[in-house]
């Protein structure tokens, strides 16, 4: 129902076989969507350096390494691809702040409830939304993310999906998340000449409508920009 197939292709991005083959073929490092330097204002704003962080769908990205260089103390990285995890374990063998585990984000039962202060998702839900049984996979992943977050913890999702296709999944009452939305242009984007839009602070949230959609007068200057959904797990006392 809410599978945004316009951004998908014929590959099953929820399948470990696909990712194993891709990492064997490509090797090297690759950061999806945004680099740490672009995301740093958001990450430092929402995640103290002492946070216990889970990076889901880590692949062979260097964002966790960059976060450790910036002072982050504990990042657990998981990915469905054993090829990627083996590669990253060897690469970061002597960096104790980084741990790598092969795991399906739809079943993270290895971890006890409320294990993490923060969960970072850079394109992982997007991948599941391009796989088979996408709505089921999304629900399984988000339920696990919610379970693993401590009360007051934060799930940060970086995605190409606008609120029309993402809010139906993340705004379910069962998760009890307070959601704040941001927009960030793709790396290297420059405003078109003659643009009259006012300069906004990067950390200025987008005011969603009551239906959880973008305001009618909100202008998306970069059509290939990314959305950042900050989902804070509400404590009982905050309700």
Predicted regions and their residues:
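Conserved alpha-helix/loop element of class I SAM-dependent methyltransferases that forms part
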Residues: 31-51, 62, 66
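A short glycine-rich, Lys/Arg-flanked "PGG" loop and its adjoining helix->strand segment in the class I
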Residues: 135-151
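A short acidic, Gly/Pro-enriched loop at the edge of an enzyme's catalytic core
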Residues: 106-119
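A short SAM/SAH-binding and catalytic strip from SAM-dependent methyltransferases
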Residues: 117-136
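Conserved Class I S-adenosyl-L-methionine
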Residues: 139, 143, 163-207, 219
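Conserved beta-strand signature within the Rossmann-like core of class I S-adenosyl-L-methionine
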Residues: 151-159
């Amino acid at each position: 129902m809410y599978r945004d197939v316009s951004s998908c292709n014929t590959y099953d991005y929820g399948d470990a076989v696909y990712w194993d083959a891709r990492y064997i073929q490509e090797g090297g490092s690759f950061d999806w969507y945004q680099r740490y330097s672009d995301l740093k204002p958001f990450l430092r704003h929402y995640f103290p350096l002492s946070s216990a962080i889970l990076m889901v769908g880590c692949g062979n990205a260097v964002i966790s390494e960059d976060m450790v260089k910036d002072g982050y103390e504990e990042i657990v990285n998981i990915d469905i691809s054993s090829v990627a995890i083996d590669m990253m374990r060897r690469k970061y063998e002597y960096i104790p702040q980084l741990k790598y585990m092969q795991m399906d984000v739809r079943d993270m039962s290895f971890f006890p409830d409320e294990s993490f202060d923060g969960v970072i998702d850079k394109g992982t839900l997007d991948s599941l939304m391009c796989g088979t049984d996408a709505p089921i996979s999304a629900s399984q992943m988000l339920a696990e993310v919610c379970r693993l977050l401590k009360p007051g913890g934060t799930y940060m999702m970086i995605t190409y999906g606008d609120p029309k296709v993402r809010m139906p999944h993340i705004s379910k009452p069962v998760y009890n998340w307070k959601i704040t939305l941001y927009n960030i242009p793709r790396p290297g984007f420059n405003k078109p000449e003659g643009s009259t839009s006012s300069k906004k602070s990067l950390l200025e949230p987008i005011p969603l409508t009551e239906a959880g959609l973008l305001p009618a007068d909100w202008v998306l200057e970069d059509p290939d920009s990314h959305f950042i959904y900050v989902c804070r797990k509400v404590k009982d006392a905050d309700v």
